[in-house]
Amino acid sequence: GATGSLFGMPYGSETSVLGYRKDIFEKHGLEVPQNYDELLALACQIPELEPGMGGLASRAASGHHAAHAFLLHLNPLGGAIFDESWEPVVNNAAGVKAAEALKTIVDCGAEGSVNFGFGEALGSFLNGDTAMFLDTTIVAGQVDNPDKSKVVGNVGWALHPMGTKRASQTGGFGIGIPANAENKDAAFLLMQWLTSKEGDKLVAMAGGNPSRFSTHADADVNAKFPHMATFGEALQYADPDWRPIIPVWGKINADLGTTLSKVLTEDLDIQEALDGVAARARTVMDEAGYYTWNE
């Protein structure tokens, strides 16, 4: 458009949910964690009950993966990167608690957890090396695929555990029409069909991620994929602001991720680490002109 803004239709909505090994939980009489205290306790209890098995698979590799994992916990624990005036608050008590949670999870994880990206964390869960997985809903299809998973039929799904509030990440994809498209009318009709109730249900029945709440609640969909009702409930708590969508976020995110990696691998003091992230983030924001209203 004239403003250069981007618009699109949601397609394949995702959020964070907790996958857990039903067989392991039943074997040891464990309850599905409802809050972070229970989650962290289980993450470190399971390796004691099942030697060689990690508690909770998590991203942790330096950069984007460590930052993503931190943000996954920051929001439910009541934290944020910025306050309403765009002042960094990542180093407040909630931020420290989120970093402590991530370190506990990684320390009690499977061998090599500190270097896990998304693929490695998922692989650890699919291979049966870890008892829990807290990340995106898009993995459900792989969990149920015998060609990719050793835990088919042994995984249950639950809402992202409560922190100070019920919250989960927001992800997914979108579809739009390029300004220079030659067949805009045809493209619009295709978008209309793909995002329709019929199209959304076809996606779900094929094992994909639907976008409509009605699809998540559909009887046919749930008969084939019983987890869909839980995923639909989880989407109601998905926070679109779980990470700042601003032009300079990439730079701040990279710094956050590399700094957190030092917390995980070098035992850098958490408060010191987050104080540094906050100070550098403010410099980036200042240089980008975010505080001109204060001048």
Report the location of each language-model feature.
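Long, aromatic- and glycine/proline-rich binding clefts that accommodate carbohydrate-like moieties
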Residues: 155-158, 205-258, 262, 287-295
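Short, solvent-exposed loop/beta-turn-alpha elements that line the ligand-binding surface or hinge
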Residues: 60-61, 79-97, 145-150, 158-168, ...
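Paired acidic/hydrophobic, glycine-rich loop segments that form the ligand-binding mouth/hinge
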Residues: 131-136
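Periplasmic solute-binding protein
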Residues: 1-32, 59-84, 169-178, 236, ...
